[in-house]
């Protein structure tokens, strides 16, 4: 009988500790959810502006046959597109970014081959694909073009 009473006391204490731990854990979960809800998340336009910069830098790198820099800029564009798909899932536009893949692959192929003529034509294809994507998501007023001047004066593209 003493063993039975000891077991009841033991389980009673253990259950109370478990309930106390559950309350503490729930409080921590609630706190983390609140912090997460107020964490900064870049907007779709910020991602697009980032791509615009790398698109321009890609052009000047390729025009100057700086294939290493062009390759770097391609990776930056790809990373930003991946971030759009990860952080902007609620946006309808996010579902369309994969339409850029064939033109990105064409530019990448030109870079790997170090072929200026192929780079020029594939870059134009990429630019037109950007505009087609903009039209597909009702942002056709946002027209991308081949840049005329480098986006930054403090970077060498040669």
Regions found by a protein language model. Give the residues of each.
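The canonical Cys-X-X-Cys-His
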Residues: 126-137
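Short, solvent-exposed, charged loop/turn and helix-capping segments
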Residues: 80-97
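C-terminal motif of bacterial Sec signal peptides marking the signal peptidase cleavage site
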Residues: 11-14
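Short cysteine/histidine-rich metal-coordination sites, predominantly Zn2+-binding motifs
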Residues: 144-154
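Amphipathic, charged alpha-helical scaffolds that flank and support histidine-based chemistry
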Residues: 63, 67, 93-96, 100, ...
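Sec-dependent signal peptide recognition
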Residues: 1-7
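Immediate post-signal-peptide N-terminus of mature secreted/exported proteins
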Residues: 19-67, 158
